[in-house]
Amino acid sequence: MREENKTYITHLKVTDVPWHRLTTAYGRGTEFPAHLAVLEQMGDLASVKESLYELTANMEHQSTLWHATPFGMVFLSRILEKALKESGKNPVAYFLAGELLDFFACILQCFHDGDEMEHAEPLPLFSDLLKEGNLWSEEYDEEEDEMRYEEDEAFPDDLFYSFYYFSWQACLLYTSPSPRD
């Protein structure tokens, strides 16, 4: 992994991401920060289940990953680390860790399947996903978004493959031994 990408992933904050301009399976990632906060707290099981469902359903649908997915994976990776550390004393953390491990397996399978096919090269930098030309409109308009999807190239090939590649990279960084511990 390129050093710039490691640094970017490691230092990325939820507030650095324009979630409202990133596509998901069912719209935009506007609500991601609130759902990530619920998971981070690992408090109420019902709330954790609801937020986990909202995130995972919007990050992956029928093996398709979306613009918000790599960014979601950065934060879910951090949450998984925390959940694993707390799983011995917090039943919600234990539940969440198991569910996240299953979801990560799904994301990694999506990457593997896509990587087996002919594909474009990924964007050079994770941060390139947030370049102005790669973001969707500032204001969400469901009809406008649907029309863009109906076009042949809703996403350029390199951008689309980058959804998969950088989702994998986010997982990879957090599965490697690190000096953070």
Q: What function would you assign to each model-found segment?
A:
Residues 12-23, 36, 55-64, 151-164:
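Boundary/linker elements of alpha-helical solenoid repeat scaffolds
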Residues 36-41, 77-81, 85:
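HEAT/HEAT-like alpha-solenoid repeats
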Residues 48-56:
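HEAT-repeat alpha-solenoid elements in large eukaryotic scaffold proteins
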Residues 174-181:
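Conserved small/polar residues in nucleotide/adenosyl-binding loops
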